[in-house]
Amino acid sequence: DIRRVNVNIAATTVENYRKLKEAGIGTYILFQETYHKKAYEELHPTGPKHDYCYHTEAMDRAMEGGIDDVGIGVLFGLDKYRYEFAGLLMHAEHLEAVHGVGPHTISVPRLKKADDIDPTQFDNGIDDEIFSKIIACIRIAVPYTGMIISTRESEEVRKKALSMGISQISGASRTSVGGYTDEERPHDTEQFDVSDQRTLDEVVQWLMDLGYIPSFCTACYREGRTGDRFMALCKSGQIQNCCHPNALMTLAEYLTDYASPETRKSGEELIKEELTTIPNEKRMRIAGEHIESIYQSNKRDFYF
């Protein structure tokens, strides 16, 4: 049941971004790779990605084309991490200053082994301690953004990253072209080696064991809570009035449709406990009724 499609494609024109907006995409995501101009040009000596300015200004063109939810990121390890960190924050500051909307998400990938890449050939790799500090500092500096960490990181690293400020993680990812169409993971075309190879069910159970509420919510996009409206709700903290019950309702859907018996049992207990903590009594009652409908009547897609 796909309710939101985020798009990660190379930098393009305002006209093409407008087409994506008209098609109803969610967030447009593009990583800078490196903010260091000389390093960027050395890594992209030819081809359509060679133009540093065209790539760096992609989010400005995306917003000009009407896309107000954008996701940025930098590949830590290509250049000095302090420079990349500063560039990332300056990019976020620029988007908010010029367009009134900062990045909807910030991703923090770091250089990892891949089919034709040996990370030891690069001199600017960062260890787990520095990586955790970067995550914490981004969270402090850009408190409204969603922070993403992928399965290129291990379970141990992802656990610590969650406590440092990560709010979105992937599970059962496939990084090869057409990877989700195959029963077995095709390693020969993977973008990077997957370190956390647990199933989505295992990741969901793990998150609940750690005290988190796994959320599959897509409500903001469909309710028009994007761009500057989303920013205002996030900065004031009011977004939690929607996020909490929506997380519980979407978790109930996942548990009913996809979870193992063990995960479903744990999740239903968590939902029962969390429902009682919703401060607004009316919202608590409505959320509870919707969750019961999910369990008993096979109804879906409730959200505030």
Give the role of each language-model region.
Residues 1-75:
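Radical SAM/AdoMet-radical enzyme domain recognition
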Residues 2-8, 21, 26, 130-151, ...:
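Mobile, glycine- and charge-enriched loop segments
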Residues 156-167, 173-304:
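Radical SAM enzyme core and accessory elements
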Residues 8-9, 50, 126, 149-150, ...:
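Residues that cap or flank secondary-structure elements
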Residues 1, 40-52, 118-127, 187-193:
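Glycine-rich tight-turn/loop motif centered on a GG-T
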Residues 21-23, 43-47, 84-88, 183-187, ...:
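Short low-complexity, flexible loop/linker segments enriched in glycine and/or proline
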Residues 27, 32, 53-117, 127-156, ...:
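Conserved C-terminal portion of the radical SAM core fold
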Residues 16-17, 39-40, 81-83, 180-181, ...:
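Short Asp/Glu-rich motifs
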